[in-house]
């Protein structure tokens, strides 16, 4: 097969998986897309629907159901498969069920001879990424999670709304768990190059207002799930950005889950931090000088994730 053709595979044909694929297709990121799902009927159905969409798309691509053995020719595999989050349920309450699913997926992908970059999206995302890397033994830099990329986008939106500016004028990151223990790093945020903290002082934005913004960020998923059952458009667009950074070797910076070896004072786990992404996955972890409060919250988030990693490891042993 022609290795110059860019190929993206999706494991999991649920709402998140197909939203990621559709975002990738509309961005013209690859020439070939493959879908793997335990439900063959669903994979074929989506493939046929995407064929119709391709006829009205400005980008040329093919899409179809594939097998795990086909992954050896793919550049990126995105893994969204897992049971969905229920209304009122935290992501961490899904650990045992999704760890077993992820373990099986990882073994199949390893067997395929896949050599590209893996992006794990299934929740709880950094715990599942640890299990995936543990089971595949893949280079840790070639395995990432969607991490806090969506959380960071939500924070940028909240800051932009507060200041009445376009979200693209805001650079801000959420670190830690993709969930309730995440940390909005206001100390490193900028708006058109100006320190957000300076703007906070100038405009008299209170600490409570900042706390409320963070609460809105981490609770937004629950708001969406309670109203429509699941989130998929936001994460679909966000993950497509990660795929684009990998396929184009852009070296863009995202808040993704990467394996830390001492950065930010933690190690031996996947957790959301600002990261430079390229064709081989992780290029560099960007170190922010966190405030004492931010650092303490980040370490606390890491501790929570480590506890859940142990639960996941126990689940796949059983």
UniProtKB/Swiss-Prot annotation:
It is found in: Cytoplasm. Pathway: Fermentation; pyruvate fermentation to lactate; (S)-lactate from pyruvate: step 1/1. It is an enzyme of class 1 (oxidoreductase). The active site is at 178 (proton acceptor). Substrate binds at residues 85, 91, 123-126, 151-154, 231. GO terms for molecular function: L-lactate dehydrogenase activity. It holds the Pfam family Ldh_1_N. The modification Phosphotyrosine is found at residue 222. GO terms for cellular component: cytoplasm. It comes from the Bacteria. NAD(+) binds at residues 16, 37, 68, 121-123, 146. Its main location: cytoplasm. It catalyses: (S)-lactate + NAD(+) = pyruvate + NADH + H(+). Its EC number is 1.1.1.27. GO terms for biological process: glycolytic process; lactate metabolic process. Keywords: Cytoplasm, NAD, Oxidoreductase, Phosphoprotein. Catalyzes the conversion of lactate to pyruvate. Homotetramer. Belongs to the LDH/MDH superfamily. LDH family. This is L-lactate dehydrogenase.
